[in-house]
Amino acid sequence: MITTVSKVFLFSLLIAISLCVSADDFTVGEITVPRGEQVSGFITVPEGMDEGSTIPVTIVHGASDGPVLALIAGIHGYEYPPITALQAMRTQVDPAALSGTIILVHIANMPAFLGRTIYYSPGDGKNLNRMFPGDPDGSITQRIAHILTTEIIDQANY
């Protein structure tokens, strides 16, 4: 049974958390971006039956409300033109002039990129393009697909 003190503590904790993360912030994985700013970082793909990984992303959260656009490069590790295009785009978007949010996934399949493989991840031999929506308990490629689906695609309008 929850006591009155416990209820007050839980309510206070809920209020404190909601004040720390403003309604105007945008969060992807471990990355939270205030309105009108741009932040780059990594989304963690946890270890499972094999190694974990990270997914480098940049989030440009516009000064005004609007739709969310997700651009994902590097589904296959050898797709260099989209990877470099998103890196260039990152420097060309002004969050103060943007309505909405852009999520740039620079390299979706880091194991394949580092392994310099064309279609398949060297860790499990799977093609990320065929793994969506993914499996949180599957192989590294299945977990990457799951993270991309739940953290990126599900938040995007386009």
Over which residues does each language-model region extend?
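Sec-dependent N-terminal signal peptides
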Residues: 7-13
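A detector of low-complexity, intrinsically disordered, Ser/Thr/Gly/Pro/Ala-rich segments
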Residues: 1-2, 13
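Structured catalytic-domain cores with a bias toward divalent-metal coordination
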Residues: 2-7, 21-158
